[in-house]
């Protein structure tokens, strides 16, 4: 049974374009299915998490990461008597707007767009779901519920100050109440993302031999798990050891989040979802001690993994590809597919750059590499 402060699909604020409900799915389940059926969701399979797609078959990509985040979010929401369908749906959609080549690709595209209001993967997720996906005759986008769109846009908290151009444009026709917190389910999706990526980036980095168990000694909290497991299982393999370490880490993070969130709900005497939205802090959180540990792990990953020679070398190549593609398309829009080129508004000075950014952002890693080799390589065998 849902808590009184949960997002109830029967009380949804609805969709921008009104539709008749179905008898066999609630509104959030319907949204989940629509997201899974998008082209953007399928393309996540060939988009970078940490390692680009051809680095290996067993490393995580944006699709496997999104699926893992959704299972964590669903479990947490279930335990708290919140809408697991909403938490799962927001989690599945949270990375739809990512460029090829992960954060290196996003940084590069944002740099290309600096004179055209920049690029944000969060805003791009909204744009995909409300404009770029073209699956229905009656409207652009996939016409999701207000609660799902709110959760995607505000899952990291209220938006104040300078608002992204597309978010502001969409918000003018469907007010997402940008200055308030999102639902508890959206907050869960955001922290499920943290739990998943710090745990699994450690696992993949060990598997890729970017770091080893000696490096993990820098994280006393993690190193203690390694010591205990080695003591208990004398002949444990490295692959099994890191899996068990990650398993313990995820369990402890989830348990901590559940305890702190229940404490916050009881302290604030929460009885309605609007009380969650209007608080001056997010209701779903870790304890202070665990937040500090998470910061340590993120710092470790940043310094030991994301800034490693191997990842840096890959990132430089990815930057060259994204910037190279942007440059050639800006110089000659006839290189774009016709269905993209015709969208350019000659009366809007930012239109050409924005259409090109949308096109590049939708590329998979391998298509971006293929397109770069076709358009930017001096090897005439590629022509």
UniProtKB/Swiss-Prot annotation:
<comment type="similarity">
    <text>Belongs to the dGTPase family. Type 2 subfamily.</text>
</comment>
<dbReference type="GO" id="GO:0008832">
    <property type="term" value="F:dGTPase activity"/>
</dbReference>
<dbReference type="GO" id="GO:0006203">
    <property type="term" value="P:dGTP catabolic process"/>
</dbReference>
<protein>
    <recommendedName>
        <fullName>Deoxyguanosinetriphosphate triphosphohydrolase-like protein</fullName>
    </recommendedName>
</protein>
<keyword id="KW-0378">Hydrolase</keyword>
<dbReference type="InterPro" id="IPR026875">
    <property type="entry name" value="PHydrolase_assoc_dom"/>
</dbReference>
<dbReference type="Pfam" id="PF13286">
    <property type="entry name" value="HD_assoc"/>
</dbReference>
<dbReference type="InterPro" id="IPR006261">
    <property type="entry name" value="dGTPase"/>
</dbReference>
<dbReference type="InterPro" id="IPR006674">
    <property type="entry name" value="HD_domain"/>
</dbReference>
<feature type="domain" description="HD">
    <location>
        <begin position="62"/>
        <end position="198"/>
    </location>
</feature>
<dbReference type="InterPro" id="IPR003607">
    <property type="entry name" value="HD/PDEase_dom"/>
</dbReference>
<dbReference type="InterPro" id="IPR023023">
    <property type="entry name" value="dNTPase_2"/>
</dbReference>
<dbReference type="InterPro" id="IPR050135">
    <property type="entry name" value="dGTPase-like"/>
</dbReference>
<dbReference type="Pfam" id="PF01966">
    <property type="entry name" value="HD"/>
</dbReference>
């Amino acid at each position: 049974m849902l808590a009184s402060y949960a997002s109830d699909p029967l009380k949804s604020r609805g969709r921008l374009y009104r539709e008749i409900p179905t008898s066999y799915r609630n509104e959030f389940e319907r949204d989940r299915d629509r997201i899974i059926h998008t082209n953007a969701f399928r393309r996540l399979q060939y988009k970078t998490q940490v390692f680009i797609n051809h680095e290996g078959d067993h490393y995580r990509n944006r699709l496997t990461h999104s699926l893992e985040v959704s299972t964590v979010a669903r479990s947490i929401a279930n335990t708290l008597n919140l809408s697991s369908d909403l938490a799962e749906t927001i989690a599945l959609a949270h990375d739809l707007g990512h460029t090829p080549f992960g954060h290196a690709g996003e940084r590069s595209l944002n740099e290309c767009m600096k004179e055209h209001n920049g690029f944000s993967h969060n805003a791009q997720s909204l744009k995909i779901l409300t404009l770029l996906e073209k699956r229905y005759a009656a409207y652009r986008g996939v016409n999701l519920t207000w609660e799902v769109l709110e959760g995607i846009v505000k899952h990291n908290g209220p938006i104040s100050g300078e608002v992204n151009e597309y978010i502001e444009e969409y918000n003018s026709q469907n007010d997402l109440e940008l200055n308030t917190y999102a639902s508890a389910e959206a907050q869960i999706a955001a922290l499920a993302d943290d739990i998943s990526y710090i745990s699994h980036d450690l696992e993949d980095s060990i598997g890729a031999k970017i770091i080893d168990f000696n490096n993990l000694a820098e994280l006393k909290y993690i190193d203690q798990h390694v010591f205990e497991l080695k003591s208990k299982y004398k002949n444990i393999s490295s692959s099994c050891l890191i899996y068990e370490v990650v398993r313990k880490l995820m369990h402890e993070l989830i348990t901590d989040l559940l305890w702190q969130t229940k404490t916050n709900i009881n302290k604030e005497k929460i009885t309605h979802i609007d009380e969650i939205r209007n608080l001056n802090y997010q209701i779903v959180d870790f304890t202070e001690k665990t937040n500090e540990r998470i910061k340590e792990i993120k710092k470790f990953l940043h310094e030991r993994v994301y800034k490693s020679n191997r990842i840096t070398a890959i990132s430089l190549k990815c930057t060259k590809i994204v910037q190279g593609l942007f440059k050639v398309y800006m110089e000659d829009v006839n290189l774009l597919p016709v269905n993209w080129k015709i969208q350019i508004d000659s009366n809007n000075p930012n239109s050409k750059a924005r259409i090109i950014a949308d096109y590049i952002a939708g590329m998979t890693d391998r298509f971006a590499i293929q397109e770069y080799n076709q358009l930017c390589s001096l090897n005439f065998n590629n022509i």
